[in-house]
Amino acid sequence: MQQESDDLLQKVRDFIKALENRSNSNDFTKFYHPEVVQTEYPNTLTKNTTTRMLKDLEAAATRGKQVLQKERYDIVNSYVAGNTVIVEAIYTGVLAIPVGKLKPGDEMKAWFAQIYEFKNGKIFRQRNYDCFENFF
């Protein structure tokens, strides 16, 4: 059981590294189950709860590459319970375009809680609770 927990946590760590280093959506979409559903709850950037399927996640990644020069996720805490991994992370994104009062090259910071549920070794459900610093 411990090995399975370690494997799931490592998959999430690898997924996050792929997000940080992405050059194309295949770098991270390989971690997703074909029937993935990602839910992002309201925050500074997303005013309403947003649900994304795989094709939506690919499109969001393309948009993200236009907004960010680079991004980093520093994992503060992580927990595994059954087929679920919970991660608390500090997010830093370096902007490529102006967002609110931030200019290109400025850092956008947030505190994330992310919940990943796995099915057949892939991320099947993902829930994001993102708390951004006020940049408007």
Give residue ranges: language-model regions.
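A solvent-exposed, acidic/Ser-Thr-rich amphipathic alpha-helical stretch
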Residues: S5, S25-G82
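Hydrophobic pocket/interface hotspot
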Residues: V12-F15, D27-T29, V36, M53, ...
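Ligand-binding pocket scaffold of soluble enzyme catalytic domains
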Residues: L8
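A beta-strand edge to alpha-helix "cap/lid" segment located at domain peripheries
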Residues: Q2-E4, E58-F136
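Short, charge-rich amphipathic segments
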Residues: M1-Q2, R13, Y41-L54, L95-A96, ...
